[in-house]
């Protein structure tokens, strides 16, 4: 598994120690790993398989990572059961949603009529392409104190 350097540096700047977890399938090993963590950051990556939330895969779906799905869907409930902070970025928030019983819109353009160009950023990556509004009274609003801009590289969206 590849993790971008900026994820690691952000955890360090926040006072944490980043730990990469191997993608295991057995519950005992996963539990042992989770028991040694203070928080869980779910990084970006490929699409969550639609079968994980009870749907057939549409032709417009992007690249998926079945092994990662298995691992993350195993450890997320363990982290939540321990009241562990869990933070998802891109794919991470999507798999967190699925783990908590949610579904995804597989392809924003074909299912919702919103042009994919708005949501699948071309290089250079990282440039803001749309506005993010923070819920009033949320921890994000308290930290950022204003709405912001974000990049976007996924056709799927939380349903």
Predicted regions and their residues:
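N-terminal beta1-alpha1 cap of cysteine-dependent amidohydrolase-like domains
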Residues: 1-87, 98-100, 105, 109-145, ...
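Conserved G/P- and acidic residue-centered "switch" motifs that form tight phosphate/ATP-binding loops
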Residues: 90
